Amino acid sequence: IKVKAAILRSGTDRPPEDYKNHLTRLAALQAYNQAGLGPEDMSVAEVHDATAVGEVIQIENLGFVEFGEGGPASLRGDTKIGGRIPVNPSGGLESKGHPVGATGIGQVFELVTQLRGEAGARQVEGAQNAIAENGGGLHGVEEAAACVTILGR
């Protein structure tokens, strides 16, 4: 399994209405560019969902859906295993736990397991590329820091 991109960015004082310049979105765009891939190339994602709205916000920021479509996409089942872009097959932070300081490596472990085809009942079939998004702290209206990692077979 190869690391195709790893981006760490710091938060800004952007106004809340400037959501298209969200820290995670900018980090994701940079990661996609570094990897030579796009959202459509991702087979599976692990995102920081310490709160229920986390998945909704981050699937928009990662470019899987248009802004404002994250909630409907999740409700349709687009983000479940077998959906258009499986998100958090590990169960996510609210389900498996949020070991602050180790959350990111837990996400990467899950994605490596997926890409190796070793995830058992949670396996995303045929996974080729995977993306992890992790954030922490608070700076204004977004994370103080965000990391986006893209892995591939």
List PLM regions with ranges.
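Feature representing long, continuous alpha-helical segments
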Residues: 22, 26, 30, 40, ...
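Active-site-proximal alpha-helical scaffold in enzymes
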Residues: 99-119
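Short glycine/threonine-rich loop-to-helix capping motif typified by GTGT followed
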Residues: 15-19, 49-72, 99, 138-147
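Short acidic capping loops at alpha-helix termini that bridge into adjacent secondary structure
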Residues: 39-43, 67
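Condensing-enzyme catalytic core mediating Claisen C-C bond formation in acyl metabolism
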Residues: 1-26, 30, 78-90, 95, ...
